[in-house]
Amino acid sequence: MRKILKREVFLVLGMALFAVLSYAFNPEIKNVVLHRQGVDSAMTMPVSIPMESGENFSIDMDVSAGFAGDFVLNIHPDDCVTDLIVNGVHLPFQSYSGYCNWNQGFLLSKAEIVKNLGKDTSDFHVQMSLINGGGLGGVTAVVDGGGFMLVLFSVIFFVLLVAFVFSIGTRFKIRRSLLLIFVIGLLLRIGYTNETFFDKRGHDVGGHVHYMKIIAEENRVPASNECWTCYHPPVYFVLSAGVWKMANLMHYFPQNAVKWFDFLISLVALGFGLACLANILSGPPLSAAALLWSVWPSFVLASPRLGNDILFYAMHAVALWGCLKYIRTNYGKYFIVAVVASFIAYWTKSTAVVTFGVLGLTFLMQFCRHPRLWSRSERVAAGIFIAAAITVACVALTHDVVGNAGGNDDTVLIRNVPGNFFFFDLQTFLTKPYTDPWHDELGRQYFWNYLAKTSLFGEFKLLETSKGITLASIISTCFVALLGFGLRGLWISRWDKVQVLIAVQAFLFFAAMIVLRLKYPFSCSNDFRYIVPVLLSCLPWVGFGFCSGGASPKLKVCGWCITLIFAVCSVVLLMSL
């Protein structure tokens, strides 16, 4: 034990050292000043305040390259840049695609700046003149460092991180195959997070940022109608506001800090999801389900996304793990873990009413015996569960699930006719690689089409090149085959308490989605991101469907080929974004 601890301590110290070196070598943005209506105001990035439509304003900031050999400024103007000056030299901003596009933004590298300046330097004074198109006005700018030393520090840090994972896994006697699959998921999320701007492929990111800023800067939780997303439960935003404050103290871009915080939460979701699968399956079925969970595209897409989805996934996975361990061992301490995680999940995202449904079923299955037979920990767990369930029921019955539904426009309205819930348009699903909330021809009217397609790629057209379309089409085709394996696995499964639990979980998640779409008839109400943890019900059936003892060798080979093709294509697509 001492040797293991000694090794782990050295690994942690090594990671801390290279994290500090990376921070020291990174460039930074400082001295941000907003010039508006004759008033100069010191600001921090991002700058986002209410302005009049057509109002002109300007922003100054200093960019220090530090020890970084190179850097790239990622600038998102709100809404249009009208002039761009660096160290007194006007830059040809109109040649930068995205200079008048908040969502797209534009990149400004050190090499581009030096080319226009005619000389190299490490300190840059940037002056931007902008015009607001309406609503909030301002700018978001992030600086990312480059150069050999930063790359070297990052590589060494992540090598030490992988070694730390294997060391911890060995200590807790976790299967090497699961550790390897976890590392695959870890590296995939590192690569995707590192290459993804904080608001890329996000949902209501501006509202989430506003929510965090209010808590971080004003030390209060805002009223539910104070911002676009302020109706959400506060747990995730309070935690993120703490990260935001720490980032400001360290002169680090707060949105990037929150992005990496979400990445860490995604590892909790990944790890506890694998632990759940290990309590449901074993052998080859476990390996297949675990690999799919690790690389499932929509799950990876959520990893760096600013929003409360990923914390809900993590807490639901912890709660499900607690329920499964309690069923397997009858130790009440696991049910206490499940109750606490469920309560946190509900105060993170209201979708966690399903988490409490799973918890309630576990309670009924395990506590339906004379109270005298309950252990002390089970009695404590029962008391905590009842108190938490009453609290959640009171809140759920008195609050809207979607507090900003009235703000959606008619372009995302859909028809809730019965046929749209029973029909699956297989041709559209296979021939149209992506979907979105606006176009009927992409399948948004059909409940199962939209749910299945967003389970893979979200509501985004990820990569519209020939390569991206080919990969997305292959993934969609493999999905249909995996669905077939899942139905077979469900049919042949032996029904014990664990199978009942995951089946009821799947039913509750799908029923919740149907109810949400019926109550709020918008295409975005049908997005799979609300129920990603349902994969922890479905993937065991997929793995069991082609890897069970009764499966023929041909079926096993076919199933593994499809699983590996799905996994490889998903990784290639995500790393091509």
Regions found by a protein language model. Give the residues of each.
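Hydrophobic, aromatic-rich transmembrane alpha-helices
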Residues: 163-168, 370, 450-499, 503
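Loop-to-helix entry region of an early transmembrane alpha helix in multi-pass inner-membrane enzymes
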Residues: 234, 238, 248-271, 469-473
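Extracytosolic helix-loop segments that constitute the early lumenal/periplasmic catalytic or substrate-binding loops
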Residues: 190-195, 205-231, 235, 243-246
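Aromatic-lined ligand-binding clefts that engage carbohydrates, nucleic acids, or primary amines
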Residues: 63-87, 126-130
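Perimembrane helix-loop-helix junctions
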Residues: 171, 322-328, 355-389, 393, ...
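Transmembrane-helix motifs of polytopic, lipid-linked glycan transferases
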Residues: 159-166, 256-281, 314, 318, ...
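Transmembrane-helix signature of polytopic, membrane-embedded enzymes
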Residues: 176, 252-256, 273-295, 314, ...
